């Protein structure tokens, strides 16, 4: 029974090796499930399981019956109207990032929101266009269009050439069809990952990586909108360093800038930025955020229409938008083939952003979130959106913040927002016809402030974790230089490389006892340390595998202060000389040491030829000699063999989670080298699976025995102290007891069973 004794930690138990512990404490027979067992569970069915699956697939069936109509409906309506207005404006603005007509941004704002209502698990995120995703789709579309055959038209891309599309230019129709295909494929990838329950892949996108990537992507968005702000004709670039080519194209024709577009964009951007800052600073006092984007859009459209900016200043405007939705199209398989890599990146970034934002709100409001179901919801939304000519989306941070801050309680707010978008598409879209594209570009840039402010993360990460800081910086550089697709792939690879680097060069340490307790810490960190004479405790804080087994060996040699293999070879060479002297009768043994009747001895050429490395690495065998050799004493003829005081080595493997074949072989070689020079090795802190794995690898033999494993460092240290006949008076003479008992150390064959006379209490 465990009972508290003040603030003291008092434990009385035997010193346990792993073998002794398993003998005294029988293990339960656990049944490890096989693949067939898991398959049976997956394929079995019951009414409860069927209900659980339906509720999981359609989360709306869980929360809609519990909807508090009187308490939540008004809040959801107010939130939905605010979110819908923002969704309309962002849809129009982010369509420019894909380089397609703005009306398709409205489609991208409508369909995903409707699908997410039924399949999503978050109650607060607003699903639709997101600037980073729009930029990635635009680059994928540019790549797909550039790979298409020169005479390829919109019809071959799946867009029928009918009267409804006659107002579109051919290149716009081609880009619309390509964007739809990219969106459908991204949705298929997300849906497949959700069905297969492998949403965990997003864990490879760390917070630092996502922050660096979105910051670099925001810079790409900024550069891509310059052509609309200056109203310049800039060709699309999809190859690496494309951002620099775009900048060159912009500044090489800067003299062609449309001043009316530039001035309008700067005014809108300035006003939007100021009001957004006011919204942020006074969010606790404002009942709802000031809808500055909507206000500026109305003003800009009215001024453009009243002053006839299109004809007077030749500004680029949104233009006529046909009311209603266009018929669905069939995705193009060839576009799938040309953009599969880009689509994978789009799918993963979309999920990572949406899931991270949804996680914040789920923790804040305490409701469950299912990552795999989120993948299904986003995937279905993108598939439907692509079929109806929209483009891939996720959740815009600002739009979700509006939905939550204006009182949104459930996805009913998302439904109201979708209805607002629907009204614009069906009835009042024509009012936006005179709106300048430069205004939409300014609105898009106004939403980048939060992402561009992430540059401040560099200093914070540098102070907290330099590896994370390096990941952020390299992700930013890769994404800027290589583009969004290749940059993301290179960033993930670099991040995984840092993980390998951390485990390949772990911070190994030498431990010692603190304050005569059972606590062992790095001996460099504390003053009151005790290290038993001739005992070294070495800790490795990472897995040991093929990449770091060599580093582990080097650090261990540094810790003990000598190479066991070098000592072994020196001793075997010395033993050959001693054995030769003894056979020739030139060596006598006295109580005071060796007496040699010759002054020197030379190896014959034949003997030197036989001194092969393999022979010198074998265990030292002195059974044929009539005397014992003390390798730390003086040897005859001044034979030089390094003297070592180490007799016991403890390896703390409590942080070693796994070994591979190469590391097992290397570890066994290291242990054999120490054992062959009479250094007892003990391994502590491992779990049962670790030892079972060593058994499967046939790790144990006549030299390396299973009895070297102990439960804790303290168990191993006490075992060594008793085994070496250490007197307790050396540690705490005032607390010694006169009574003594016979204590048997049972090492289960690893070491010879010996009987020691030790004190009743063993204290430091």
Swiss-Prot record:
UniProt record, GO biological process: cellular response to cAMP; chloride transmembrane transport; intracellular pH elevation; membrane hyperpolarization; monoatomic anion transport; monoatomic ion transport; sperm capacitation; sulfate transmembrane transport
Modifications after synthesis and translation: N-glycosylation is required for efficient cell surface expression, and protection from proteolytic degradation.
Pfam families: STAS (PF01740), Sulfate_transp (PF00916)
Residues glycosylated per entry: 153, 161, 165
Motif (PDZ-binding): 761-764
Localization: Apical cell membrane; Membrane; Cell membrane
Top-rank taxon: Eukaryota
Membrane topology qualifier: Multi-pass membrane protein
Residues covered by the STAS domain: 525-720
NCBIfam families found in the cross-reference section: sulP (TIGR00815)
Family: Belongs to the SLC26A/SulP transporter (TC 2.A.53) family.
UniProt disease annotation: Diarrhea 1, secretory chloride, congenital: A disease characterized by voluminous watery stools containing an excess of chloride. The children with this disease are often premature.
Protein name: Chloride anion exchanger
Gene: SLC26A3
